[in-house]
């Protein structure tokens, strides 16, 4: 049995938590995040900490409580520190630029690729081959990074494409004659 739910989530100073039934709203310096929790989870806010437990009558109560604890911990970290995700473009002529809330990509297609960023996510390009995504919602940051990577995934022979900064691309050997 996992014991993730047994550890409380510490709520730092400057973070406001509102519990309205199963809807939890966490507000901090980086914004406001809201999440609806599973009915099997019971949340209590006391002494600058959130504690989690299962409700009676649910077989998967502890599992859902552990999931809820992990999600709310990510929300607290997001509204205090924020999350970043870095992408690299590898390939001749592969370039990225940010104009407002649109990421412009040149990925070897016959047309440029424009990706609209969702609300709460900012992007910057320190160089033409790097993209840095920042925001408070961990799930949305990961989804935007996955969407950008999906335009041109790293191919296995030369490794060209859009990759995460910490991703290791396994390359294959070329066909032997």
UniProtKB/Swiss-Prot annotation:
Keywords assigned: Ribonucleoprotein, Ribosomal protein, RNA-binding, rRNA-binding
One CC-aspect GO term: cytosolic large ribosomal subunit
InterPro entries on file: Ribosomal_uL6-like, Ribosomal_uL6-like_a/b-dom_sf, Ribosomal_uL6_a/b-dom, Ribosomal_uL6_bac-type, Ribosomal_uL6_CS
GO biological process: cytoplasmic translation
Record flagged with keyword RNA-binding: yes
Taxonomic superkingdom: Bacteria
GO MF annotation: an example: rRNA binding
Protein function: This protein binds to the 23S rRNA, and is important in its secondary structure. It is located near the subunit interface in the base of the L7/L12 stalk, and near the tRNA binding site of the peptidyltransferase center.
Name of the protein this chain belongs to: Large ribosomal subunit protein uL6
């Amino acid at each position: 049995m996992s014991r993730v739910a047994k550890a409380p989530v510490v709520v730092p100073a400057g973070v406001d938590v509102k519990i309205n039934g199963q809807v939890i709203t966490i507000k901090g310096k980086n914004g406001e995040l809201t999440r609806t929790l599973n009915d099997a989870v019971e949340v209590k806010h006391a002494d600058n900490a959130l504690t989690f437990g299962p409700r009676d009558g649910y077989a998967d109560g502890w599992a859902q409580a552990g999931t809820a604890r992990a999600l709310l911990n990510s929300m607290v970290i997001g509204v205090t520190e924020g999350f970043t995700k870095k992408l690299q473009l590898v390939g001749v002529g592969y370039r990225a630029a940010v104009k407002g809330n649109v990421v412009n990509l040149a990925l070897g297609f016959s047309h440029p690729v424009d990706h609209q960023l969702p609300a709460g996510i900012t992007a910057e390009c320190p160089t033409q081959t790097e993209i840095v995504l920042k925001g408070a919602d961990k799930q949305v940051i990961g989804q935007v990074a996955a969407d950008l990577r999906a335009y041109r995934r790293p191919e296995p022979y030369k490794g060209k494409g859009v990759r995460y900064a910490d991703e290791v691309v396994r390359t294959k050997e070329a066909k032997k004659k």
